[in-house]
Regions:
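N-terminal targeting signals for export/organelle localization
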Residues: 2-4, 18-82
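The canonical Cys-X-X-Cys-His
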Residues: 112-116, 229-231
Length: 255
Protein backbone atom coordinates (compact mmCIF):
# COMPACT_ATOMS: atom_id res chain seq x y z
CA UNK A 1 0.00 0.00 0.00
CA UNK A 2 1.42 3.39 -0.96
CA UNK A 3 1.87 6.09 1.69
CA UNK A 4 -0.91 8.34 0.30
CA UNK A 5 -3.32 5.39 0.21
CA UNK A 6 -2.34 4.37 3.73
CA UNK A 7 -2.70 7.96 4.92
CA UNK A 8 -6.13 8.26 3.34
CA UNK A 9 -7.35 5.09 5.04
CA UNK A 10 -5.83 6.19 8.36
CA UNK A 11 -7.41 9.62 8.20
CA UNK A 12 -10.76 8.22 7.09
CA UNK A 13 -10.85 5.84 10.04
CA UNK A 14 -9.86 8.58 12.46
CA UNK A 15 -12.39 10.96 10.97
CA UNK A 16 -15.14 8.38 11.33
CA UNK A 17 -14.20 7.77 14.95
CA UNK A 18 -13.97 11.46 15.71
CA UNK A 19 -17.28 12.37 14.08
CA UNK A 20 -19.28 9.45 15.39
CA UNK A 21 -17.72 9.04 18.81
CA UNK A 22 -16.82 12.65 19.47
CA UNK A 23 -13.45 11.59 20.90
CA UNK A 24 -11.08 14.58 20.98
CA UNK A 25 -8.05 12.35 21.52
CA UNK A 26 -8.58 10.81 18.10
CA UNK A 27 -8.61 14.14 16.29
CA UNK A 28 -5.70 15.23 14.11
CA UNK A 29 -3.58 18.33 14.33
CA UNK A 30 -3.98 19.26 10.68
CA UNK A 31 -1.27 21.91 10.88
CA UNK A 32 1.35 19.21 11.50
CA UNK A 33 0.49 17.25 8.36
CA UNK A 34 2.68 17.08 5.30
CA UNK A 35 1.22 18.31 2.02
CA UNK A 36 0.41 14.78 0.79
CA UNK A 37 -1.15 13.93 4.15
CA UNK A 38 -3.23 17.11 4.11
CA UNK A 39 -4.50 16.39 0.62
CA UNK A 40 -5.25 12.79 1.53
CA UNK A 41 -7.10 13.94 4.63
CA UNK A 42 -9.23 16.28 2.56
CA UNK A 43 -10.13 13.46 0.21
CA UNK A 44 -10.87 11.20 3.17
CA UNK A 45 -13.23 13.79 4.67
CA UNK A 46 -15.05 14.26 1.40
CA UNK A 47 -15.28 10.54 0.73
CA UNK A 48 -16.50 9.71 4.21
CA UNK A 49 -19.19 12.39 4.18
CA UNK A 50 -20.34 11.41 0.69
CA UNK A 51 -20.75 7.82 1.86
CA UNK A 52 -22.24 8.79 5.23
CA UNK A 53 -24.30 11.99 4.72
CA UNK A 54 -26.18 11.39 7.94
CA UNK A 55 -23.00 12.07 9.89
CA UNK A 56 -22.91 15.62 8.54
CA UNK A 57 -26.44 16.22 9.82
CA UNK A 58 -25.37 14.87 13.21
CA UNK A 59 -22.41 17.24 13.27
CA UNK A 60 -24.61 20.20 12.30
CA UNK A 61 -27.15 19.29 14.98
CA UNK A 62 -24.40 19.01 17.59
CA UNK A 63 -22.93 22.38 16.60
CA UNK A 64 -26.38 23.98 16.79
CA UNK A 65 -26.91 22.47 20.23
CA UNK A 66 -23.56 23.79 21.42
CA UNK A 67 -24.35 27.24 20.03
CA UNK A 68 -27.77 27.22 21.70
CA UNK A 69 -26.18 26.24 25.01
CA UNK A 70 -23.61 29.01 24.67
CA UNK A 71 -26.37 31.50 23.78
CA UNK A 72 -28.41 30.42 26.80
CA UNK A 73 -25.42 30.72 29.11
CA UNK A 74 -24.62 34.17 27.74
CA UNK A 75 -28.25 35.25 28.06
CA UNK A 76 -28.34 34.12 31.68
CA UNK A 77 -25.34 36.28 32.48
CA UNK A 78 -26.95 39.27 30.76
CA UNK A 79 -30.21 38.83 32.67
CA UNK A 80 -28.52 38.41 36.04
CA UNK A 81 -26.38 41.51 35.56
CA UNK A 82 -29.46 43.59 34.66
CA UNK A 83 -32.02 41.97 36.96
CA UNK A 84 -32.99 45.12 38.85
CA UNK A 85 -33.76 47.08 35.68
CA UNK A 86 -35.66 44.13 34.21
CA UNK A 87 -37.84 43.23 37.16
CA UNK A 88 -37.97 46.30 39.42
CA UNK A 89 -37.60 49.43 37.27
CA UNK A 90 -40.45 51.22 39.08
CA UNK A 91 -42.06 52.64 35.93
CA UNK A 92 -43.27 49.74 33.78
CA UNK A 93 -46.84 48.50 33.92
CA UNK A 94 -47.32 45.44 36.13
CA UNK A 95 -50.23 43.05 35.59
CA UNK A 96 -51.23 39.54 36.51
CA UNK A 97 -50.58 38.63 40.13
CA UNK A 98 -48.44 41.42 41.67
CA UNK A 99 -47.26 38.91 44.29
CA UNK A 100 -46.67 36.09 41.81
CA UNK A 101 -43.75 33.76 42.41
CA UNK A 102 -42.60 34.11 38.80
CA UNK A 103 -42.26 37.31 36.78
CA UNK A 104 -42.63 37.32 33.01
CA UNK A 105 -41.35 40.44 31.24
CA UNK A 106 -42.27 41.18 27.62
CA UNK A 107 -40.61 43.71 25.31
CA UNK A 108 -43.25 44.83 22.80
CA UNK A 109 -43.91 46.96 19.73
CA UNK A 110 -47.56 47.65 18.84
CA UNK A 111 -46.87 47.36 15.11
CA UNK A 112 -45.26 43.94 15.53
CA UNK A 113 -47.51 41.24 14.08
CA UNK A 114 -46.04 38.55 16.31
CA UNK A 115 -46.59 40.73 19.39
CA UNK A 116 -50.24 40.97 18.40
CA UNK A 117 -50.39 37.22 17.89
CA UNK A 118 -48.74 36.57 21.25
CA UNK A 119 -50.91 39.04 23.17
CA UNK A 120 -53.99 36.88 23.71
CA UNK A 121 -51.85 33.84 24.48
CA UNK A 122 -49.77 35.70 27.06
CA UNK A 123 -52.95 36.93 28.73
CA UNK A 124 -54.28 33.37 28.81
CA UNK A 125 -51.00 32.13 30.27
CA UNK A 126 -51.08 34.74 33.02
CA UNK A 127 -54.78 34.27 33.79
CA UNK A 128 -54.81 30.48 33.86
CA UNK A 129 -51.58 30.21 35.83
CA UNK A 130 -52.60 32.64 38.54
CA UNK A 131 -49.10 32.95 40.00
CA UNK A 132 -47.38 35.06 37.33
CA UNK A 133 -46.42 38.69 37.69
CA UNK A 134 -46.48 40.19 34.18
CA UNK A 135 -44.47 43.27 33.17
CA UNK A 136 -44.64 45.07 29.82
CA UNK A 137 -41.62 46.96 28.47
CA UNK A 138 -42.44 49.43 25.71
CA UNK A 139 -39.78 48.87 23.04
CA UNK A 140 -40.79 50.63 19.79
CA UNK A 141 -38.44 49.61 16.99
CA UNK A 142 -40.61 49.56 13.86
CA UNK A 143 -40.69 53.22 12.96
CA UNK A 144 -42.27 56.50 13.94
CA UNK A 145 -45.78 55.14 14.44
CA UNK A 146 -44.43 52.56 16.86
CA UNK A 147 -42.80 55.32 18.87
CA UNK A 148 -46.02 57.38 18.88
CA UNK A 149 -48.05 54.38 20.07
CA UNK A 150 -45.60 53.64 22.89
CA UNK A 151 -45.46 57.30 23.88
CA UNK A 152 -49.25 57.30 24.13
CA UNK A 153 -49.34 54.07 26.14
CA UNK A 154 -46.69 55.26 28.60
CA UNK A 155 -48.47 58.61 28.91
CA UNK A 156 -51.70 56.75 29.68
CA UNK A 157 -49.96 54.95 32.54
CA UNK A 158 -48.41 58.13 33.91
CA UNK A 159 -51.45 60.38 33.45
CA UNK A 160 -54.37 58.04 34.07
CA UNK A 161 -52.94 55.02 35.88
CA UNK A 162 -52.48 51.27 35.37
CA UNK A 163 -56.09 50.48 34.44
CA UNK A 164 -55.97 53.08 31.67
CA UNK A 165 -52.70 51.63 30.41
CA UNK A 166 -54.19 48.14 30.36
CA UNK A 167 -57.12 49.38 28.26
CA UNK A 168 -54.81 51.12 25.80
CA UNK A 169 -52.39 48.22 25.59
CA UNK A 170 -55.14 45.67 24.98
CA UNK A 171 -57.06 47.96 22.65
CA UNK A 172 -54.08 48.72 20.43
CA UNK A 173 -53.66 45.01 19.80
CA UNK A 174 -57.29 43.97 19.45
CA UNK A 175 -59.31 46.95 18.20
CA UNK A 176 -57.21 49.81 16.86
CA UNK A 177 -56.47 49.76 13.14
CA UNK A 178 -54.90 52.27 10.79
CA UNK A 179 -52.31 54.99 11.19
CA UNK A 180 -51.05 55.53 14.72
CA UNK A 181 -51.18 59.29 15.10
CA UNK A 182 -51.60 61.23 18.31
CA UNK A 183 -54.99 62.52 17.16
CA UNK A 184 -56.36 59.09 16.28
CA UNK A 185 -54.99 57.56 19.47
CA UNK A 186 -56.58 60.30 21.56
CA UNK A 187 -59.93 59.69 19.88
CA UNK A 188 -59.55 55.96 20.43
CA UNK A 189 -58.80 56.48 24.12
CA UNK A 190 -61.86 58.69 24.43
CA UNK A 191 -63.97 55.91 22.91
CA UNK A 192 -62.60 53.63 25.64
CA UNK A 193 -63.89 56.03 28.27
CA UNK A 194 -60.55 57.71 28.98
CA UNK A 195 -59.46 61.34 28.76
CA UNK A 196 -57.72 61.03 25.41
CA UNK A 197 -56.78 64.70 25.23
CA UNK A 198 -55.05 64.63 28.61
CA UNK A 199 -53.12 61.51 27.69
CA UNK A 200 -52.04 62.98 24.34
CA UNK A 201 -50.88 66.13 26.14
CA UNK A 202 -48.47 64.02 28.20
CA UNK A 203 -46.91 62.14 25.30
CA UNK A 204 -43.95 64.47 24.85
CA UNK A 205 -43.08 64.83 28.52
CA UNK A 206 -39.51 64.21 29.73
CA UNK A 207 -40.86 61.42 31.94
CA UNK A 208 -42.27 59.51 28.96
CA UNK A 209 -39.06 60.04 26.99
CA UNK A 210 -37.01 58.71 29.91
CA UNK A 211 -39.04 55.49 30.10
CA UNK A 212 -38.57 54.75 26.41
CA UNK A 213 -34.90 55.68 26.51
CA UNK A 214 -34.26 53.50 29.57
CA UNK A 215 -36.01 50.58 27.87
CA UNK A 216 -33.91 51.06 24.75
CA UNK A 217 -30.70 51.08 26.78
CA UNK A 218 -31.78 47.98 28.69
CA UNK A 219 -32.58 46.17 25.45
CA UNK A 220 -29.14 47.05 24.12
CA UNK A 221 -27.48 45.62 27.22
CA UNK A 222 -29.55 42.45 26.85
CA UNK A 223 -28.74 42.28 23.13
CA UNK A 224 -32.44 42.36 22.26
CA UNK A 225 -33.04 43.34 18.66
CA UNK A 226 -36.60 42.18 18.00
CA UNK A 227 -40.07 41.80 19.46
CA UNK A 228 -41.61 40.07 21.18
CA UNK A 229 -38.82 39.16 23.57
CA UNK A 230 -39.61 37.59 26.93
CA UNK A 231 -37.57 37.38 30.11
CA UNK A 232 -38.36 34.99 32.94
CA UNK A 233 -36.05 33.80 35.65
CA UNK A 234 -32.58 34.04 34.15
CA UNK A 235 -33.75 33.14 30.65
CA UNK A 236 -34.37 35.16 27.51
CA UNK A 237 -36.91 33.98 24.97
CA UNK A 238 -36.40 35.77 21.67
CA UNK A 239 -39.40 35.80 19.36
CA UNK A 240 -42.92 34.42 19.31
CA UNK A 241 -43.57 31.08 20.98
CA UNK A 242 -47.03 29.44 21.07
CA UNK A 243 -48.89 29.18 24.36
CA UNK A 244 -47.86 25.60 25.11
CA UNK A 245 -44.23 26.52 24.51
CA UNK A 246 -44.56 29.39 26.96
CA UNK A 247 -46.11 27.07 29.54
CA UNK A 248 -43.23 24.65 29.08
CA UNK A 249 -40.72 27.44 29.63
CA UNK A 250 -42.55 28.59 32.76
CA UNK A 251 -42.42 25.03 34.10
CA UNK A 252 -38.72 24.79 33.25
CA UNK A 253 -37.89 28.05 35.03
CA UNK A 254 -39.83 26.97 38.09
CA UNK A 255 -37.96 23.69 38.06
Amino acid sequence: MTRPAFAQRRFALALAATLTLGTPALAFDITSMTQPESEAFGEAVRGYLMENPGVLMEVIAELEAQQAEAQSSGDSALVLSNAADIYEDGFSWVGGNPEGSLTVVEFIDYRCGYCRKAHSEVLELVETDGDIRYIVKEFPILGEESVIASQFAVAALQVAGPEAYEKINHGLYTEFRGAMTAERLAAFATDLGLDGAAIAAGMDSPEVAKVLNDNQLLAQRLQIEGTPTFVMGDQLLRGYVPLEGMRAMVADVRG
